[in-house]
Amino acid sequence: VKIGCCVSLFHDAVFTLSELGVDYAEIGLSELSLHSGEEISERAERLSEAGVPCLAGNVLFPGELALTGPHTELSAISEYLGATLEKAALLGVRTVVFGSGGSRRAPEGFPREAAWEQLRGLCAELLSPALQKHGMTCCIEPLNRRECNILNTSEECACLVREVGKPNIRLLVDLYHFDLEREPLSVLAGYGDILAHAHIASAKNGRALPKEGDGEDYAAFFQALRSIGYSGSLSLEGSVSGTFEDCIAESAAYVRNFSALKA
């Protein structure tokens, strides 16, 4: 399993990840719209010089871009998506994460079934072809019900992935959201064919990054991943205590111990 770290492309700490024992950066995608291709290419060059691959990106859509409800604008969504993936390609991004709770949230009173169909259509008809152009994969991320009102569990997201039926639309499992939704680890057994990315943080400790003695059973999570043959990417996505460098280095080393264990 490759261990990554979620950090802004425009936070200079991103250039230190290799030194901290991290395999790749996972950057925020929605902020790319605020920067020119030239700026992004310059950051990409510096990442290359620092030996930090930028393999993943999250927050695919900004909160103000509605993906569900009566006021969605497919032309605006398509235009944003095309421009954002073009910029992500400059960085070498291979996996994009579709969490984006603000944009996918169904408006109050809007039928859930209609919102589901909008998201299914978005993934199948807009997102999948746009990804194919760049050889990217999108992983749908379950978000706990405090953050969004649709696609809250891995089971729901897996159902959507299978309904879409596209090889570049896959599933992400985030241990933080997984635990808040009280999903049993046993459900992971059914995702061996669609799981393509993972996030990790502690639900018991306010989304803090994993560290020894924090009360979480990370061994069971990694055992469940190993049992389905998962050997992909897993990103640290949580709050930092102390200095960024010390916290990331400690957490990456701790998590890597679990990922290296044999089944």
Sequence positions of predicted segments:
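Histidine-acidic metal/acid-base catalytic patches
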Residues: 2, 10-21, 77-78, 86-94, ...
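Active-site acidic/histidine proton-transfer and metal-coordination neighborhood
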Residues: 49, 67-170
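Glycine-rich, proline-tolerant flexible connector loops at the mouths of alpha/beta enzymes
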Residues: 27-47, 100-107
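Active-site beta-loop-alpha junctions enriched in small/polar residues
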Residues: 6-10, 28-32, 59-62, 101-103, ...
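Short, function-defining helix-loop hinge/capping sites that tune catalysis or transport
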Residues: 34, 64-66, 149, 182, ...
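Short, structured active-site "lid" loops
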Residues: 51-54
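Basic, amphipathic N-terminal segments that precede the first structured/catalytic domain
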Residues: 14-34
